[in-house]
């Protein structure tokens, strides 16, 4: 994958565009970004940290979401399913930083 030339607003626009399709196909109830991109501190080698909430967690669906967004954004996407059992440190970061669409 190439350098990330997308900024926070670009990525949020892509997520908004994909939200209804992901909800219908994969049961996504919420999604957003966190990490350096959400904080406005992303560099050209930064990945996209994506948080999703789903009706029924499904690893197969998460892989599809990841691959579709990597193709569209042309950069690496790390995806986290947000749930009660999410690592406490990661959950706190997401709670503080996440920008949902």
Where are these regions (language model features)?
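Catalytic core of pol beta-like nucleotidyltransferases
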Residues: 1-30, 38-44, 54-101
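Conserved histidines in hydrophobic membrane contexts and catalytic metal-binding motifs
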Residues: 33
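Short beta-strand->loop micro-motif that forms the acidic, two-metal-ion catalytic signature
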Residues: 49-52
